[in-house]
Amino acid sequence: MIINISNKEDFQTLLKSEKPILLDFYADWCGPCKALLPIVEKLADKHKDDFAIAKINVDNNGELAQEFGVRSIPALFFLKDGKIQ
């Protein structure tokens, strides 16, 4: 399952999860982000018990994107115990 992060509070709640997290920073208008989506969806299906996948729209969550140093999209980060791996 893919979790859509709407705000920083959603993100903080997600960080409390014991599972590692794959963060996918994207934008609705981004062609490469759209091309990556089927791959992310397959990962979500195949590894649903191993890690969570969260999508973060940079247009709606600029502060989070800035915290992660996102300069271009798509941008993927893998977190374990709240830290980038």
Segments (PLM) and residue ranges:
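Proteins that catalyze or organize thiol-disulfide redox chemistry
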Residues: 1-52, 59-85
